[in-house]
Amino acid sequence: MSRNEALFEASQKVIPGGVNSPVRAFRSVGGTPVFFSRARGSRVWDADGREYIDYVGSWGPAILGHAHPGTVKAVQDAAANGLSFGAPSEAELTIATRITELLPSVEKVRLVSSGTEATMSAIRLARGFTGRSKFIKFEGCYHGHADFLLVKAGSGALTFGNPTSAGVPPEVAAQTIVLDYNDVAGLERTFAEIGDEIACIIVEPFAGNMNLVKPSAEFMAAMRRLCDEHGALLIFDEVMTGFRVDLGCAQKLLGIRPDLTTLGKVIGGGMPVGAFGGRADVMDALAPVGPVYQAGTLSGNPVAVAAGLATLASVSEPGFYPALAARTEKLVKGLTAAAREAGVTFCADSVGGMFGLYFAAEPPASFAEVMRCDKEKFNRFFHAMLDHGVYLAPSAFEAGFVSAAHSDADIDATVAAAREVFRTL
């Protein structure tokens, strides 16, 4: 029995399913999950000492690569001054100011400790500000595990082939309107029927939890227009895309200004963190100045804030994002060419440092199209690449990530491995 297998067997006795987040269990792809012992740069090492080129990057935060020296030093320095205050700090002001400088749509911002906290707080705020209860989300999009968001969820929920969750009361789910991603006609019909009951739309501007799915310009424009016409708020869930695709996030690339934005992952540099912000008049509805309550013991944690500030400083360097996008495009083009040579139906797409791999002729534009991709072929591809020392997301429903630490040699080695694997599929 390998060390990975022994750890998984032991973990299942004391941790539900042996993991602390469902997608890590490899239920989608089969087999034993990999237990990591350390990570540095573009590489991770498992409990058996095997080394992998990592394209998961802790599900997005590791944009600089693992254990980046500047981030590690910032964490060490902050920790030496106290792990948590439970009180305001100057560092909170510094990171909040930096976020508002980088995102014109964010006039005020509040820090929390996770992406789920950010999205559920943003929706509560939208409901409180508008006085309405219903909100729109899109099938396959994942916005955390709050009850009212686990309706046609993406990410790990899709891994089980069951896009909802037990334990979500029907009366809670009834307030969640689920539409198809990129379906402009469906949006217009819904607003025509109940527009005055809708508090907000929440959307992943580039969906990354049903693999990478890009929005059409018409879809983006329709959401902004319909929210304006009916007094609803538009929330961009940029927990994944925030500072991952551009220094101005997805909203800059798409040219759409949301009313509220949720952030996480990159702004914590690998530490647990989240944030939500937007229009000042909306944000001022939050306690202690407004009637919408939100709180958190570890919100604005000084160690997480230090890691975030160090990361934002690095990604703000001139040329960072063009270089990251070029590296990601090189990977995508190399994999596509390797599949073509082998006669495998496959395509790939990317935006910034995010990418999607699809065993289909064209990149999907909706959840339904994602579900038509060849999942079994992906599973075989995943395990074969793992055997070749390449760690991809263990699910056909997840985007992948390239970091600044990935070298041309890493990309070349990955494409070479894929070339061998595609020939066996």
Curated annotation (Swiss-Prot):
Keyword Cytoplasm: yes
Cellular localization per UniProt: Cytoplasm
Keywords associated with the record: Cytoplasm, Isomerase, Porphyrin biosynthesis, Pyridoxal phosphate
Modified residues (N6-(pyridoxal phosphate)lysine): K265
Pathway: Porphyrin-containing compound metabolism; protoporphyrin-IX biosynthesis; 5-aminolevulinate from L-glutamyl-tRNA(Glu): step 2/2
Cofactor: pyridoxal 5'-phosphate
Protein name (record): Glutamate-1-semialdehyde 2,1-aminomutase
Catalytic activity: (S)-4-amino-5-oxopentanoate = 5-aminolevulinate
EC identifiers of the protein: 5.4.3.8
